[in-house]
């Protein structure tokens, strides 16, 4: 593709109208940042924040023994260097991990028996080994046991308080019942809910429910305090025979007056039985009325807020929370009570729920309430006040048992309007009281319920946090063991390492990385699938949802997903909606909420200030679309602007807009943003398109798309597939397997060497058996910029993602071969290897130490001819480059046989003639069926201390040679650059003393002027001995430079010596294994019938026929098309994007053809510049091309002759006008259709056909991997039926429906064969075999084994069933 030497990248013609305001953040930062925060590896212990690993240690330590006489305190932790680097871990099957050392302090105390005062007796500090912790590679993955794994981030419900209702489903009446739930990060859940009688209940950890007031009383509140907390109190004054109450203006709204209410001037403000209106309340306030009259009927039935007591006798007339009846009211009168307090409950704005719940609960004291809670949580345990108090305190108020986390506290404060500090991560009494108050408010019609699918209520747990939780689990297990050891042993004689056994911690970490649901085998099919896997968000996993329980709401797209989670990319099938992908610009904040960037808008003017907003922060803002038309000053052109507000689309005044999207592709994920014309595709097909791009196999020759979206470069750069330059510099040397770059002077780090060596990955195997191969795209002498791409990886071309090939397609039916989405292709594609891919299989052979003796890897295998062993070397391992077919031996191995009892004669013969060859059997590694290819590598792993065979020595020698070459190059480049520096210092100076060589010959005379020629005579190693006449500081510089050179050389040598030592050392093999050999085979897969192919728009199909080139339909100029697709696949699927892509691709190819014509006619470089400028219609490109030297312009033209690459970004793609314009410029009809001719007859087809360039991918569902046939093979032990599946070399299952079909045809004999001899009739099988051998063709079917199994099953149920033979 078109590229420039200056920056090694494709020149894409961009059609986007919206300037990029902000760079897309690094695509795998979600992984890297999370783990960096967790480890804090680069920071000194004093500078570490209380997060991640540090927080875990601080939360579990100090550990005290049961008698509080000694404690184990945490000081700090440090990480060592990993034993193997990433490459070695891949090869040896090791885990890439660093050792963790923790510095702990053991303090023992003397306790004074009388006063209880503690005095320190002894302090011991020690560093303890704490197992290993896996490290993350540069690309955001982990290497566990030699395979790359990804930890998927989990989307779970945020801790905090959630209010909800049951939508009327719980009770038969359909009444809406509200509930509240306090969810901590860890600890007991607390639920409050109403029942259909409006009583309030509480559940702790989903146990049986209690009246909520029991919990409130257990907090230490009395009934009276609770009533006064939740209800407002009115004071009633007894005035002779009548009553009046104090005016409380807040409570009057909506109430009725029981009698006329008069102002101070006697004017009637509210008539009897009329409501207090706002105007009336205002009048009351103005006339300063203190009391209003109340009728007796109004007071009867009200509730006393405190005990009403007769002061003279001390007798309680009306108890707190008791209704005042007529008789009680009379008694109050007669006893001369002057005033009393009642609760304000109007059954309109304030309901009697809590008061009625109090009537239900009989607890008198907090102790009773706590004992009741203890009974519910620990049924069967006899409760004591002490144990009940301890349990209650530990439920919600003990930081070790209960943790809301900072997020939970923030959410709680936000919802309930509290002011608690963020580090208060346990519940407080106020929290519980306020939750109840908010819930009662909901029942009374105030407040709103929460939407649990809102992204403000769901947060992301990334790697760091998931591992932090696991580490805490391991530490807590260890804590118990430490406490027991402290109390069992005498502490004075112990050191910290005697107490600590880090096994539980290592085991938990190992288990998490090895077998957690969120630790997944990385999808490494191509660079896009890697990136997508790392950006995935899963609602499944421990502490998350399960597929079965997840309803429709959780899976659905939510308005808050906009710009945070992609609405398109999710798997089809049972996981739909539960697994999502992060949007392109989204990031995760420190609290785990997903944020998206917006531009700030001030008074209708869009600024370039960018702020990230979480879903909660964005609430209420009116947010304009990224494509809203603006003038040059950044103001909205239209009076009314399309915007989003609170999850709705609205038309709104431009002055009210507060934020604006940064880019149209902010909405979608990386995979979806790679689909051009996504806006013209149906969502279901876009979903398939984004999922299928992840299954595209890397092809032999990558071909970047002619019609792209501009995201291709970013994906290739961030995925780690391509090699990215670490510093600015100049390319020193390049070959296929490495690039050496000399770093610019100013860029060298303190401890750096000044040289970057990039060893490229050559034909390595990925997790999915695809081929990983990197090839350089720079030349010697090229300048490289930091962050620039210097080598292409799998599926990348010129630093851009290239998953498929640009092919010429026609939409037309062709003799039925594209029926039902089949695809017809030209043989040309197969001939040119356009869709050929390389797959690498790894096969392993292990020699073990068995009971009968050692297995041996050798080429001396009994009973095999020369032909079978022709490709094995003397060590018994296949040579590299051998072409192998199924059944060929890759590694020769013999295993000792079990000794049989020998007869005396045999023993005698043995004694005379020695051992015979018959006591070993051939257990060689052979190539499995269906695999055919070339051996490209073999690795031998042998135990430490065992003799190395010739193959191992050869492999070691080549690896060491490679390392020594790297070492030599690094030292050479450093010496050259130092040489230059020193020469510039010395030339022009005068020498102070003469310098002689070993033979006494003068190299430099005293007082001689130093020149380059003179220096050339002096050996470089002796330059430091040159003394100068008048330059003391130059001498210092000279000495410093030489010393620095020596140090850097030493450093390089030490690093390489260490690497060489590792190669020579033996390998750590599993117990019982003597030697292990891995053989790698490269398989070339050409495109063949049955392979699955797809475009980027969800247009998938299976290859139905490969047609000779001359039979394909051809264009007027004789060009045959390469692929024929069915036009009926478009209308019903509604993915019109593929047609638009085809049109634009045609225009791109047409412009390329025009450039080729210029080349063919030998136009001058100047004319070439003009032509390229015309094609791009972009001033910046024109400037760039004008600045290029002539030869590079011609090189660029040759690149562009294949087609001018274009970018049509998502949601801001090419308009219809632009499309027609491009087609016409390229010399085609604006309809994009043309007459095609039948390749077989040469006649024109009747209708015009849409023809153009489409980007097609070959997917990882290859027919060679799936096709399978069984002759005889393994049988299941129990049923004696053949196994199923290709891996087991199984048969094809014949189910009920197939039997019905055979019955329908009346094919009785065939059916009997299917069900007996071909399946599980054991005796019949052997009889059949014998009959075939003898040449008799008769079927004698016996009894199927599965029938015997059925009889045995019945007999196990005590039903005696037996078969009786029919009597003749």
Curated annotation (Swiss-Prot):
At the top level, the lineage of the source is Bacteria
Q: What is one cellular component GO term in this UniProt entry? A: DNA-directed RNA polymerase complex
Give coiled-coil spans as residue ranges. Answer: none
Q: Supply one GO BP term.
A: DNA-templated transcription
Entry EC no(s): 2.7.7.6
Task: Alphabetically list the UniProt keywords.
Answer: DNA-directed RNA polymerase, Nucleotidyltransferase, Transcription, Transferase
> Under which main EC class is this enzyme filed?
transferase
Question: Which reaction(s) does its UniProt entry say it catalyses?
Answer: RNA(n) + a ribonucleoside 5'-triphosphate = RNA(n+1) + diphosphate
SUPFAM superfamilies reported for this sequence: beta and beta-prime subunits of DNA dependent RNA-polymerase
- Report the GO molecular function annotations: DNA binding; DNA-directed RNA polymerase activity; ribonucleoside binding
Query: Keyword Acyltransferase, does the record have it?
Result: no
- Biological role: DNA-dependent RNA polymerase catalyzes the transcription of DNA into RNA using the four ribonucleoside triphosphates as substrates.
Task: Give the family from UniProt.
Answer: Belongs to the RNA polymerase beta chain family.
- Self-association state and partner proteins as the record states: The RNAP catalytic core consists of 2 alpha, 1 beta, 1 beta' and 1 omega subunit. When a sigma factor is associated with the core the holoenzyme is formed, which can initiate transcription.
| Protein name as catalogued | DNA-directed RNA polymerase subunit beta
Organism this protein belongs to: Syntrophotalea carbinolica (strain DSM 2380 / NBRC 103641 / GraBd1)
Gene that produces this protein? rpoB
